[in-house]
């Protein structure tokens, strides 16, 4: 059984007991969260597609780690022949969640 769920504007294909990294959101670790924006559910070959969402379908998750930083991304700007160089970098913040259950 799997589902396609929208979490913070991004769509993810999720299955039960799957660990997933999503964009960081403020919540305490271990607290259960329910996502209602379920777009598609596959229940052993029986596929239900929403228009655009499936009414009554939910995905229960819990937060394993509230803040996880991704790899550093470097951004380099340069203008030729002028000596202008600028190097910026940032690390994207993620939250690690665990899919507890998919309810139809």
Swiss-Prot record:
GO terms for cellular component: cytoplasm; ribonucleoprotein complex; ribosome. Keywords: Ribonucleoprotein, Ribosomal protein, RNA-binding, rRNA-binding. GO terms for biological process: translation. SUPFAM superfamilies: L21p-like (SSF141091). NCBIfam families: L21. This protein binds to 23S rRNA in the presence of protein L20. This is Large ribosomal subunit protein bL21. It comes from Azobacteroides pseudotrichonymphae genomovar. CFP2.
């Amino acid at each position: 059984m799997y589902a396609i769920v929208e979490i913070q504007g991004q769509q993810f294909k999720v299955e039960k007991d799957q660990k997933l990294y999503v964009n960081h959101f403020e919540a305490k670790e271990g607290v259960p969260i329910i996502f209602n924006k379920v777009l598609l559910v596959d229940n052993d070959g029986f596929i239900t597609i929403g228009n655009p969402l499936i009414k009554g379908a939910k995905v229960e998750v819990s937060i394993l780690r509230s803040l996880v930083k991704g790899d550093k991304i470097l951004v380099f700007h340069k203008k030729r022949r002028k000596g202008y160089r600028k190097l910026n970098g940032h690390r994207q913040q993620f939250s690690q969640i665990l899919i507890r259950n998919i309810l139809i």
